[in-house]
Amino acid sequence: MSPSFAGSGGNTLPVIKPQEIPEIEMRPGIRGQFLASAAHGARGVWLLVNTVDPGAAAPLHKHTVEETMVVLEGTVWVRLGDERYTVGPQHTVIIPAEIPHAWGNSGPGMAKLLWAFGGPDPFHDSIYLEGSPPVSSPPMPGQP
């Protein structure tokens, strides 16, 4: 179990070890590891790492909160409204709240993406304009 430390005002600040967080299959070819979420005690931000197989994609959807994607590895396409972009390692994409978007791995190898979402649960109020929602419940640290 990860250690925690008392912060100012007696708040507990968890230290989360990624090796203690299981990776879940969010949709075919897309796995997720929630690095920070409400399940970990985070209240204002969620962090998620996706590992994405070649050709795998998330369908058109929108969130009520802003999100940011950082491409760590690979090449992905991103659709924002009517525009389509190709982005690679170290590129950052800021997706405003309520903007329909989709994305997928367009490269020959695995892609790895880091996501940051504002709010307590970015998936709760998501609207899928195509396809179905992903599995999005982050497991608690130390649980399978």
Question: How would you describe each model-predicted region?
Answer:
Residues 59-60, 78-79, 95, 101-107:
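Short beta-strand His + acidic residue motifs that chelate non-heme Fe in jelly-roll/DSBH
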Residues 1-44, 126-144:
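A short, N-terminal "cap"/entry segment at the start of jelly-roll beta-barrel domains
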Residues 82-97:
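Short acidic-glycine-tyrosine-enriched beta hairpin
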Residues 66-76, 81:
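Glycine- and acidic-residue-biased ligand/ion/polar-headgroup-sensing regions
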Residues 31-33, 48-63:
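Conserved short histidine dyad/triad with adjacent acidic residue
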Residues 56, 64-65, 83, 99-100, ...:
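A generic "binding-loop/recognition-motif" signal
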Residues 49-50, 94, 109-126:
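A short hydrophobic beta-strand segment most commonly corresponding to one strand
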